[in-house]
Design a protein with these regions (language model features):
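Intrinsically disordered, low-complexity, charged/polar segments
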Residues: 39-114
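Basic/aromatic-rich interaction segments and small domains that mediate binding to polyanionic partners
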Residues: 10-50
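Short coil-to-beta transition motif at edge beta-strands of beta-rich domains
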Residues: 1-12
Length: 114
């Protein structure tokens, strides 16, 4: 997981504290991509995290996102063994930038759209 600040204002919303299984890194274009658990409801999140803890790298495509490397900070690696006993905490924070002002978007709104 890490802190993230989106670069573009064209996004309808983004997660400021993603928990992502990184599956691709593109250093030439300066981005990485993977499955962000926070785009899943907590029960689905827990199930997917447990499969990651067992070595799987699959996830629903609705949680696949691309991130700019330079916009990620405070990166923390979660050992796979810790994902086996994963308990979803409400650590996601979805926001939208409107005229330079950051507005929080409820998680339930995000989950209902995906």
């Amino acid at each position: 997981y890490y802190s993230y600040s989106a670069k573009t204002e064209s996004l309808p919303f983004y997660d400021t504290f993603p928990m992502t299984l990184v599956v691709d890194i593109d250093p030439i274009n300066g981005h990485f991509s993977g499955g962000n658990l926070h785009y899943l409801r907590p029960t689905a999140r827990q199930s997917i995290a447990k499969t990651w803890g067992s070595g799987s790298i699959s996830y629903p495509m609705r949680c696949h996102h691309k991130y700019f490397i330079g916009r990620a900070s405070n990166i923390r690696l979660v050992p796979a063994v810790d994902l086996r006993d994963f308990v979803p905490l409400p650590s996601e924070q979805f926001v939208r930038e409107l005229g330079g002002v950051r507005v929080e978007i409820p998680s339930s709104f995000i989950w209902s759209r995906l």
